[in-house]
Amino acid sequence: MAVHRALAAYAISLYVLLPRKSGATDKGAIKFETWEPLCLLTQDFGNLYNRAHKLNLDIDTYVTAAQADQLRLQILLSRASSKIEAAAAAAATAAIAADLAGKAKHVASCKLAATTLTATTGYLHGRIAEFLEVMTAHRGTTNKYGCLSKSRSDNSNSITDSVANLKDKCKLTVQQISPDNKATEQITKAGFTKLTATGGLTSSDLGGSGQAVCMILSTTASEVVNNGNLDEPVPYAGGYLRRKHDLTSDGNDNLATITDSASAPATRAKTDPYLQIWRAFKNLEDCESTFTSGYSRPSPETLKAADETKTAIKNYVVQKEGKYDQATDKEDDYKNLDKIFKDGKDFYPQKLWDAMDKKDLLKDATQTNEIKKLADITDRSELNKVLLYYTRQKEQTLTKELKEAQEKATQANQNDAAAKAAEDSCNKLVGGEKCNADKKCSYETETDGTKKCKFNATKAEKSGAPVTQAQTVGETEATPEKCKGKDAKTCGTTQGCKWEGETCKDSSILVTKKFALTVVSAAFVALLF
């Protein structure tokens, strides 16, 4: 019996003393399944660079397209042949301005998101790349045993990949960046799909096969720094594979399922480079939903619902200055918006977009040797030149009209004064004989039956009286009083008067108002750009 016990004890001692070829050990190669997720992640980093680049381009394209349309609409406004067209162009311009104002805060934050994602990805890309390259390079020249297992096996220490091969396989360097929004597989809004290790680099992550030759993964103090144990964990791969001296768990976050409040700050800091990318990635996806679909022109429904449209109607159709005010402005002036703004080529805003597609820009406006379409001009500086040309043309026309109207108004006032003096002169003549003897007076019966000497413009014209010539002009010229109270038919036949809305108005005043609106429009453009 004693012999059996002795043999058993001897066998146990041999089992303990002899080296074992299975199980985890220090100095073993890092298992393939431990480091492969990092290789897959660096392969996916190219998609992050491309998406960040595309977002930047999408933002610029959106803003540029919207601002170009604003300029085109301002050009149409300066060339408008009707009040409705002018109002529609002004309304569409205001709608685009409102859209850009709403996007302004997103432009800054989303450009920052794209830059942040590129910077944080580049940093971690370099950290992971260096870790994998260094571990790959740590292999022997003869049997190729080293620090990374080549395949999915606990007993595979052999390394056949060179650093160059691994760099190509894992895309450890930044590839050609081009705009693309291809979805990433290794990172989502939930986290990093395959980074499931939560203990850092532990002994269970090392392979066996008895080839414990990776000295940098030794737990023996003299083999690592020859000065005691490691003073703090080594943050391999940006902290995901943090290695403590004894290869025990370091307690990292689970990067596969991240929440902003998942861990205490002390734990979170261990893998902060990953968390920075994750936050920037979430911001990127939010921004993509805002800008990737691109700029779209305002719809009829948008224009009908906007107060800015009613302001445009007020300014250009009703011919009143200022913003639309529901409390003071007559709703009747704005009740037909649904008849102006609706789908179809015969309505706005489609008529505006069609007008942009007509080849009718003057050569002088484009400063080229060809007549162009407004839609074909995309450069904002060129559009500004065209706008300036047509704005000056309109100002010159209105300035001329204003001068002529003012001259006519002055002449009309002078004629009115002469006519009044003639009337007073006739009124002073007593008796029909004296009255009728005057070349400009007639003895007429009043409505009450009495007789009175009055000025007779027809008699004055036939007799060639000087005051008659002045009065003849005055009869056809307009003053505010002469236009006041006339109906539409009479107003249209009176020189210097024009029917506006429901009132006969002095055309000189209308020209002045039109000129003022043109100046305001030009100033508005200057403020926008």
Swiss-Prot record:
Its main location: membrane. The keyword Transmembrane helix does not apply. This is Variant surface glycoprotein MITAT 1.6. Glycans are attached at residue 456. It is a lipid-anchor; GPI-anchor. Pfam families: Trypan_glycop, Trypan_glycop_C. A lipid is attached at residue 506 (GPI-anchor amidated aspartate). N-glycosylated; glycan is composed of 6 to 9 mannose residues. VSG forms a coat on the surface of the parasite. The trypanosome evades the immune response of the host by expressing a series of antigenically distinct VSGs from an estimated 1000 VSG genes. Residues 1-24 form the signal peptide. GO terms for cellular component: plasma membrane; side of membrane. The lineage of its organism: Eukaryota, Discoba, Euglenozoa, Kinetoplastea, Metakinetoplastina. Disulfide bonds join 39-170, 147-214. It is found in: Cell membrane. GO terms for biological process: symbiont-mediated evasion of host immune response. The keyword Cell membrane applies. Keywords: Cell membrane, Disulfide bond, Glycoprotein, GPI-anchor, Lipoprotein, Membrane, Signal, Trypanosomiasis. Residues 507-529 form a propeptide.
